[in-house]
Amino acid sequence: MKEIVIASNNQGKINDFKVIFPDYHVIGISELILDFDVEETGSTFEENAILKSEAAAKALNKTVIADDSGLEVFALNGEPGIYSARYAGENKSDEANIEKLLNKLGNTTDRRAQFVCVISMSGPDMETKVFKGTVSGEIADGKYGENGFGYDPIFYVPKLDRTMAQLSKEQKGQISHRRNAINLLEAYLAGDQNV
């Protein structure tokens, strides 16, 4: 079985990759390097993904995939953006992040939002490649559903009439921002150099 190393300690992301790549042995970097942590000093999802994949590829001397992803709310000028995981502060819970977002959004009628995922692939003998996927939706007025992680309970997908947290892992795996970025990665790996 082929192996994919994910430069992330976020078990939710690793689980997403496992669902999307069922024919691969998906390994989180913490299984290979204890305490692997890269400071996300970039100002964009792309910069942060590249920082992680290049650092991990150098440390392991093998090809590694990293992603940086988050939620952008149009009425909040793209917040929480690259700060999605720590929107309410360092070491805060998903619940605290959601609460801050809903409070900040208040009764705003423009609830349009998008999840963004940028995947970068780096290796010892290759130029880093970057793939971006998005999924559009709206911020719900409260939390709905029990599945997923992060902002999934408040991210409503109109075409499915569900939040991401109301979808099964398999359903989410077919439409997510990560899935859309991975589609581009897979096309590249299959030889489509125009991706």
Curated annotation (Swiss-Prot):
It catalyses: XTP + H2O = XMP + diphosphate + H(+); dITP + H2O = dIMP + diphosphate + H(+); ITP + H2O = IMP + diphosphate + H(+). Pfam families: Ham1p_like. One of its GO terms (biological process) is purine nucleoside triphosphate catabolic process. Binds 1 Mg(2+) ion per subunit. Its cofactor is Mg(2+). The keyword Metal-binding applies. HAMAP family: Non_canon_purine_NTPase. NCBIfam families: PRK14822.1 (NF011397), RdgB/HAM1 family non-canonical purine NTP pyrophosphatase (TIGR00042). This is dITP/XTP pyrophosphatase. The lineage of its organism: Bacteria, Bacillati, Bacillota, Bacilli, Bacillales.
